[in-house]
Amino acid sequence: PLAMAAIDMLIDVLSRSRERFARALDGVTVEQANTQPTPELAPRVDSLTWLCWHTARELDTQVSALAGTETVWATRGHRERFALPLPDDTEDWRHTPEEAAQVVVSDLGALVAYLDDAYALATAYLHALTPQVLDDVVDTSWAPPVTRAVRLASVIDDAAQHSGQAVYTRRLLGLPG
């Protein structure tokens, strides 16, 4: 059926963005990952760390809300591992360049672990869906109201956008790929 094909397509598109993040992080040092590559010329070109963290955060918060579960940020110890100097409810999509620069890691393993957990959460959620629930309204604060399918497409599109930005950021750092 067409609706099941839509779920399979969402899973495929989501997995492609994770593969791009893996390529963007391949061989990168912690210092390179934490660097905003063009802070004076283009301060909104964020670091690899911020792009990965933000994407994981969006997948985590949006899918957890849809699933009615706590975030993996809270339940898998990521909050403690990152120990960011930002409020736990920081609206990362509204970060200034100065706030984005505060998202740094001392261990790339922590960053990759959060990405992996967020992608695993989203993928498991998608696999568990039935086509009948895609048209369920999940947010009435928008006009028109947002369906489950639209919310999922939005967060997966965000992941695709930021994974592409991560590859570009890698190149701005002078790294191949």
Predicted regions and their residues:
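A generic structural signal for well-ordered alpha-helical segments enriched in polar/charged residues
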Residues: 19, 23, 27, 61, ...
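Short, contiguous alpha-helical
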Residues: 11-25, 33-94, 137-177
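Short Lys/Arg-rich basic patches
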Residues: 6-10
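Acidic/histidine-rich alpha-helical segments that form the ligand environment
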Residues: 85-135, 153
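Short, Lys/Arg-enriched N-terminal segments with co-localized hydrophobic residues
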Residues: 1-4
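A short secondary-structure junction motif
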Residues: 28-31, 129-132, 169
